[in-house]
């Protein structure tokens, strides 16, 4: 009977929903396992094929862990606040809440159609006031502990979207979304002091099971470095402080560079100290149109303006050195000023060459240098030269001596610095969590009483940001006007909202107890489920969401709300699913390729023509999926054509889980055929109890390998092993009931619908669902082959292959080799001078004569 995947999948999805198969409660009799995947932003486009790759992998792990006896929490929810929904709502004159509900309903139906074992009773939504009540509560705790504050700061301002943009959203001075000009604007923003947790965020990584690239990216993003702050005097009488990790090179500092936004520069301009003020102001205006990312690109041309009217004073030799402004120095890193040592820094060297500045070697290495041609940067080790009291010292000793000198002479001190900046926590938009703060002219900023939470969004119809950059909420005076919780006088609400990252910074805690009214989760639930045992997500979230949520969790731990210092014990990441590039020559239909070859004469010329038409991307056959390229795969269509189990199996089989992989429709059909072959085995049952001798070793090997591979996310090799086993069963005329039962059990986490149906077909009652049926066990001794194939070589050339006992002795193996007719012929008339047996692999006979 042909497998009817549509009927079977609908049947088991209904069973799981009706019987709440995957509903979970606290059970102290079982070990707990909390598996977490990043909850999706419910966009209007619906689920794409990239989502199920992560969800399926942890679903496979979760299903296996249930069968291993664990009490498994595997939840799902919606990260539903955000700009795309708000923009769609504005364009179509629909309230964002209505758009969000529609999108969530669509996503939910798509996920249920794929058979994920989520506990849907724990579903959460960041836009639900009962959820964001606790997001607001966490903000209030941060404020009360001095970690939330207001600050005037330079921000990227989109003149079209009328809101603050992250650096990543600015490309060539325009908004990535709308193409409008982006300018720097000073705005008062709410900030979260994540820098207070910089050390804890780095040091906490040591005890976690994070894949190496995740840990490395977080450490690099935080950017902890050990160096010194050095105070340079100026001819204007002020002090310029710089941070450097190479204070040993101070004698080689021949100029200084400050950021265009530096506070001292503003003061010097106001006092009339700067003689070339017009040129300086023009450069400041130009820099204001660039993002921090554009300004700090290493390969960009170095630009700058020397300040006419003020010089710096090198503290070690009292030499006056010029001061420049340049956009590659950022006000947000270090002190916004640097000392430049062009002999030993490529960027400083290029700048010095352009402006004709002195270049003084101060570190002599083991290899020769030519400072006329390039900076000598191999200076991690070496000996100090041209450096006064540091001459002859090693780099390590020179750093120590210079810091001592700076401190003794009041010229500086040792310092630990971080690249990490405090978190900008304001958005001038409607569709986000209201910030629970009010401003009173008498009392200043005051937090709302916790009893008044949640502070809900007003039900409005105009979501357009104001031309003055204010949030749309600012226009709704009835909502804005309130009373001060401190003095009872008139006050105004904060009209900025929280960023989308807010709700996702603690959602994993709410899953533990999603209906709790008195706290973000009950103490019992937090103590039972914490921490998350395994979290899988995208690498693109490593330095934003993952870092922010670790910060919030560590703060909640410090104030006694959660029982563990870290939120996630294990973090893995999946590779992106890529699509075929329709503009690449190799992906064109054959007739289109022939047409281009006739027109241009060669494939190389045709590819050049495609590049001229479509750009450099046409050279890449495999690219990121995008609507503009028309290569986006709709999972609904795949499920409709092949079934959910086939799609799940394919996404796990398509390659190394951690690496990007191209979507290949032809390979889906192969996975579908494999499932059909497994289904057909139920029609080919053979007589016999248990495992047959000729298949027993492979059965035990497969149980062992599939179990181990699931736990290390080597899903593709686990499936390949199952395919090998199924082929062997067909080669042996079919499967016994016990053999097929084991295949079904091992395949169940990957293809849960079909395997539940087969399990029932094999005579198991409804109370024996595979979802909780114990995982098969293997015996280590039976994983070892009783016989092995060895090669027999004569003078290095293979003459025969023999099947021998796996535990055969060296003497018996050599004797068996010599007894083989082909080997005996090769030895005829010759003298054996050396005999070697490599256990389980080969016999090598060296002969002469």
Describe the function of each predicted region:
Residues 1-36, 66-75, 99-106, 281-324, ...:
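Conserved oxyanion/phosphate-binding beta-strand-loop segments in alpha/beta enzyme cores
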Residues 214-241, 290-319, 323-324, 423, ...:
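Flexible, glycine/threonine-enriched loop-and-boundary segments that flank and lead into catalytic domains
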